[in-house]
Amino acid sequence: MGCPLLNTEKFLGGEVITMRSVGNGAGEFDAVQQPDMEGFDKTSNHAVPWKVEEDGPVYTSYKMRTPIRNAVIEQTLRVYHQVKNIDMDVDLLNWDAVLYREYRLMWPLAFQRSSVSYEVPFGALTVGKDEMPGAAGERYYVENSKQRPRGIGNWLSAAGEKCAVTLSSSVAVADYIDPTDQPVDYTILQPILLASRKSCHPLGNDFIQPGDHSYHFSLTSHEVNSPLREEFGTSSNEPLVAVYNPIQYGKAFLPEEVSFVSVDNPNVKVTAIKKCEDDNSLIVRMYNCSNKEETVHLRMFVEPKEIIHTNLIEEELSSVQEIILGKYAIETYKIKF
């Protein structure tokens, strides 16, 4: 991309930190609690060499194992040779299951002024721009734009002036601001791996999550406002399943390559393919992740006889010759064969 991606002055790319984080499991009430520095530790405090595990034409993988407060961290890094992405598997092992301890994976970015976005259902949210104005109300008084950490979907992304970074994630919650003392002013993508909590009920139990925990992440860079953000962030969490030397049916007629349904517009995402509730038609639900009207064509394994625009509960609205989605639209179509 021609621009630096990581700023490793304070944290290394992909290192794990742990902090104390006192809070409840069901509701944080006015604001989500923030961690503090009691018992702070990070994997770079216990530096060990990375060892080459595999080396081939597709990727080279490296592995390291090191202690951290109350656990052991094992990380596997895969650097791909033909495609621009790095995979990281993180295993949190021998966890002592203590209360009020939090672990985060740190990706410090070399972006002084960046916009942070993440996947939400049927779209993406940009921090400080797309939240509902004000606070949620009732007992919640903190402005929505200032609440963090955030619940995320498949990915978390940050865009600088010249390039962007997207991190696919297997966790539900992430942060983007340095939570430690003397915080830095650049963005740090932080999937939260584990946080032990106590029930908000006065007689409730502790949620200490005993056992080993495993996570998977993928990192890539791309141009700002590129559709690769959604494509990479989602596809990395939905890998292809390989079938080796399958038994062939005697009357097999399908070609070696065939797609059940595909679309020709990278800004349109298919979220559901299912049988219609009322008949044997096929239902396809999709959304437009761009801020302009988009036209999309479905390529199917059998030519459809009719495409019908429906509402969300699959009631027919009108037959269409072409599928056009308005900006950020979520639409449902019935396919008849």
Predicted regions and their residues:
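C-terminal (or distal) subdomains of carbohydrate-active enzymes
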Residues: 1-337
